[in-house]
Design a protein with these regions (language model features):
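Short, Lys/Arg-enriched N-terminal segments with co-localized hydrophobic residues
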Residues: 1, 8-30
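Bacterial N-terminal signal peptides that target proteins for export
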Residues: 30-38
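Bacterial N-terminal signal peptides
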Residues: 39-46
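Acidic/polar low-complexity flexible segments
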Residues: 52-82, 162-165, 169-228, 276-324
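Sequence context of c-type cytochrome heme-c attachment sites
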Residues: 52-92, 106-131
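The canonical Cys-X-X-Cys-His
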Residues: 92-102, 191
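Short, well-ordered beta-strand segments enriched in hydrophobic/aromatic residues
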Residues: 140-147, 265-271
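Long, low-complexity, polar/charged, intrinsically disordered or flexibly structured peripheral segments
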Residues: 205-260
């Protein structure tokens, strides 16, 4: 990312403004006035930094298919009797490496929609593409997701029951460096057979990572945008999943904003490379495993569409290579 001409204009004028202000008032003037000048410079600098956001028309897109996974937690994934691909995973193969083919997924969607793997009711739209774009600079990672949100959730699917009834939610999970098989399975290490909305599970038990350790890197960092209702009340979440899902505490997500018109949604995340507890520290040259989840038609819990596991590279070769 580079500064635009408008950014240079703002920064240069901010500099001359502060110089003039301090010279005019002299060293004998009050500290209060000096601080006012510095604050004004800070405002202009912040404005200039915002103007340096990516020109998305110049950032490459990559379609990632998200799908309704039904009742297929990590325990199912690693059960050879249920999932023949367990052997490949055990050998180091990724789910995407096996199931992504010519831009789509070769999954058995008839089985995924059956009572065996979706005992409640499957949505009519079992999969759809999400166009992902990514860019970064010295301070931030920028991600944009574009997709057409379906409105045909299965009858009986868990839905929002408290205002605002979020029509759409879009989330990205980043796997910590010590998550087992993180680069292979995406966010599946947070999905277990005993979490809420799974058959017979505790309705209060949230997503978790087995043997989680935030300091040790065995956890997921995640960011989410929630649409609110009728274009109002949108919110954002900066949390993580360790011993349980925590929807607060993150300090890296600067802004999540989105818009849905006639079902066409565009969601943009601005995330600092550094952050607080639960925020993965990112740097140029790094490759981060991730997964995408979209809740459409006011659904909650496991009634979402999710991606397989992919990798994001900050200037490094990966499934998605973020532009600098």
């Amino acid at each position: 990312l580079t500064l635009k001409s408008t950014d240079s204009f703002l920064l240069s004028h901010a500099y001359y403004f502060l110089t003039f202000f301090l010279n005019k008032n002299g060293a004998e003037k009050t500290m209060k006035k000096t601080q006012t000048g510095i604050a004004a410079l800070g405002i202009l600098l912040a404005f200039g930094a915002q103007a340096a956001a990516p020109d998305w028309s110049k950032v490459a897109k990559r379609d990632i298919q998200v799908f309704h996974a039904g009742v297929t937690p990590i325990e199912w994934l690693m059960n050879k009797q249920e999932h023949s691909g367990r052997t490949g995973i055990s050998k180091g193969e990724s789910c995407a490496g096996c199931h992504e083919e010519k831009g789509t997924l070769n999954l058995d969607f008839k089985r995924l929609a059956s009572k065996e793997l979706e005992p409640v009711a499957a949505p009519k739209t079992m999969k759809f593409p999400v166009a992902m774009q990514a860019a970064y600079d010295a301070e931030n990672l920028y991600i944009r997701l574009s997709f057409k949100s379906p409105s045909d959730a299965g009858a009986g699917a868990d839905k929002e029951d408290k205002a605002p009834l979020n029509e759409v939610k879009a989330a990205i999970m980043f796997a910590g460096p010590k998550v087992g098989m993180g680069p292979q399975v995406g966010c599946w290490q947070t999905c277990h057979s005993d979490v809420r909305s799974m058959p017979g599970a505790d309705p209060k038990k949230k997503k978790y990572v087995k043997d989680a350790n935030v300091a040790g890197g065995n956890y997921y960092d995640y960011i989410q945008w929630k649409s609110g209702e009728a274009g109002a009340g949108a919110t954002q979440v900066d949390g993580h999943v360790a011993a349980e899902r925590v929807n607060k505490g993150g300090q890296a997500l600067t802004k999540a904003e989105g818009e849905c018109k006639a079902g066409l949604c565009t969601v943009t995340f601005t995330r600092k490379l550094s952050g607080g507890e639960g925020d993965l520290a990112l740097a140029e040259g790094q490759v981060i495993p991730f997964g995408i989840a979209i809740h459409a038609d006011k659904t909650v819990h496991r009634f979402h569409h999710v991606s397989l596991g992919y990798t994001l590279g900050l200037g490094a070769a990966a499934d998605i290579k973020a532009s600098k």
